A protein has these predicted regions:
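N-terminal lobe/hinge region of extracytoplasmic solute-binding protein
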Residues: 53-104, 135, 205-207
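Gly/Pro-rich hinge or "lid" segments in bacterial periplasmic/extracellular proteins
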Residues: 88-91, 179-238, 242
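Aromatic- and charge-enriched surface segment that lines or borders ligand/interaction sites
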Residues: 98-142, 157, 163-165, 260, ...
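Surface-exposed binding/hinge segments that line
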Residues: 112, 146-191, 216
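Detector for C-terminal structural segments
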Residues: 25, 318-346, 386-395, 420-541
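Alpha-helical secondary-structure segments
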Residues: 51, 126-133, 159-165, 208-209, ...
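Ligand-site clamp/hinge motif
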Residues: 230-276, 404
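Bacterial lipoprotein signal-peptidase II cleavage site
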Residues: 30-39
Length: 541
């Protein structure tokens, strides 16, 4: 089902990594510096600049059809989608489409396209451009293109109407709101140059409120965006007119730049640094539940963890409350679907720490205290402090059960390559791994992580349950026609997964943000991880 290339599922863990490794330097990294002209914490809002504090390079890619990594934070200010998901209400709202309707069988979706919209080159956007954008995304088939898997064909019968004809029912209104692979753009903007090559040169072709002003690869000020005068939303009232993406990999430096007003908004900090900013009267700190959770994927294909009793024993032996307390900025996970996303069920039979049950299960499998010793290999992403903390705690928690946990930190490409080995014996036993949805729907977790896949791609537990496969195959079409029934089916699937224990559900991340007090109107939207929709904000006077 998932055939597209996914270059970096670890994006947000790596961003945090850069921030968490140097807490001890918080008081010493840099002195006070002067505030630049147009900084958001003051000055004239007519020319106000919003400076985003990033921790890893922003523009990993430039192609709106294939982007699937850090660039989401910039792309969503240059490009727009047909719809946008409102996490506060759980509703899909109009954006480049003003309205839509579906057939009774949810296999035909008709969208009315907003008039008066221009691309950044001045060309008027029509329904034909919408069709061309999504057709190219499907044809290129990279990044998150799989989200359009239900589409059989797209028609643009006139300038303001787009019709999706589907192979099976799917929630196209929700899919159209995705932060990846759903951007509408001028597919002809590159002229005679191949689009992929043209985009890679640092060009954009969107309809969004901002367009590229300057790109400096590898520099601290990596990307500057400027307001697009022809933006359909208009520029009346107070808006940020410029957006800067500043890459600062040192935690203490970023915190100091926030204090000095040189960074408007910082995406994530250690709890220590974040708490240190709470007392500053010029800074606002916020928290928000994310849709990003941390898994311990268990190797069900080889070794001791091929035995479900051993997997269940590890699930009972894990101190979930202790884990989230030690990691900070996490809450316990109840099942797979995070709180705040439809399908979440707080009444699932989630595991609670029970060492007596863990010992009994291990002994029934021939292991445990007094039984055969067990050695397991765990890998985590190099430099990720949260994963490192989790790995250390799991090692100490499992030791009394006669389980030796060998822990290795690997660069993500190395870790992923090992996990995808076609030889089950070459894979790790436990892999620490983050996931978040490609659009605000539970389907992404289930089709990618727990549907059988050969060779493995993101099913890094190598879980293979034909009954669950059939349920996952049914649930996306059902979500478009009968959401209550889909929610019930997701509960059934999660109940089975909890029983079979192909993964440890270690926690859901909490976003801890810091921003200038002068920023008005900010609302965190976990459907778009760490994206700030700058146009919607109001700079302070």
């Amino acid at each position: 089902m998932l055939t597209a290339d996914h270059p970096n599922r670890q994006r947000w863990s790596l961003a945090v990594t850069a921030f968490v490794t140097v807490v001890a330097l918080a008081a010493s990294a840099c002195g006070s510096t002067s505030k630049p002209a147009g900084a958001s914490s003051g000055g004239n809002p007519v020319n106000a600049t919003f400076t985003y504090g990033a921790f890893t390079p922003v523009m990993v890619g430039w192609d709106p059809s294939t982007d699937y990594s850090n660039e989401i934070i910039a792309m969503n200010n240059m490009y727009e989608t047909l719809t946008r998901y409102d996490s506060q209400t759980g509703q899909v709202k109009p954006l480049l489409a003003t309205s839509w309707k579906k057939s009774a069988d949810a296999k035909t979706w008709t969208f009315t396209i907003r008039q008066g919209v221009k691309f950044h080159d001045g060309k008027a956007m029509t329904a034909a451009d919408v069709k061309a954008s999504i057709d190219r995304t499907i044809t290129v088939n990279q990044g998150a293109a799989y989200i359009w898997g239900a589409v059989k064909s797209i028609a643009a019968p006139n300038a303001t109407t787009v019709v999706f004809h589907l192979k099976y029912p799917a929630p196209i209104d929700l899919i159209s709101s995705a932060g990846y692979a759903a951007f509408i753009y001028d597919t002809k903007a590159s002229g005679s140059t191949p689009p992929a090559k043209w985009f890679a040169q640092g060009h954009d072709a969107g309809t969004g409120p901002y367009t590229v002003a300057q790109y400096s690869k590898g520099q601290e000020i990596e990307l500057r965006l400027k307001s697009f005068p022809g933006y359909w939303g208009g520029w009346s009232g107070a808006h940020y007119k410029n957006v800067v993406f500043r890459v600062v990999s040192t935690a203490s430096t970023t915190a100091q730049l926030v204090r000095d007003g040189q960074i408007t908004w910082a995406e994530q900090m250690t709890p220590q640094l974040w708490n240190s900013l709470k007392s500053d009267p010029n800074i606002v700190t916020t928290t928000a539940t994310s849709y990003q959770n941390l898994f311990g994927m268990l190797n069900t294909s080889h070794g001791p963890l091929a035995n479900v009793k051993v997997r269940q024993a590890l699930a009972y032996a894990t101190d979930y409350k202790g884990l989230v307390a030690a990691m900070g900025a996490f809450t316990p996970s109840i099942g797979i679907i995070p709180k705040g996303l439809w399908g979440y069920n707080r009444n699932l039979p989630a595991y609670q720490t029970n060492m007596a049950k863990a010992k009994a299960l291990l002994q029934s499998a021939g292991y445990g205290p007094g039984g055969k010793a067990m050695t397991l290999n765990l890998t985590y992403t190099q430099g990720d402090q949260y994963e490192q903390t989790a790995a250390s705690l799991l090692k100490s928690e499992y030791a009394p059960l006669n389980i030796k946990l060998n822990v290795a930190s690997l660069a993500w490409p190395t870790q992923w390559s090992k996990a995808k080995s076609t030889n089950p014996a070459s894979r790790q036993d436990i892999l620490l791994f983050y996931w978040w949805p490609d659009y605000p729907d539970p389907y992404s977790w289930f089709i990618n992580l727990f549907h059988s896949a050969n060779p493995p791609y993101f099913n890094l537990a190598y879980y293979d349950n034909p009954t669950v496969d059939k349920q996952i195959d049914r649930v996306e079409p059902l979500s478009a026609t009968n959401r209550p029934a889909a929610i019930n089916l997701y509960t059934q699937i999660q109940t089975t997964l909890l029983k079979d224990s192909p993964a440890l559900f270690l926690g859901t991340q909490t976003y801890e943000r810091a921003m200038q007090k002068s920023v008005g109107g900010y609302v965190d939207n976990p459907a778009y991880p760490s994206v700030v929709f700058v146009y919607s904000l109001k700079p302070g006077q």
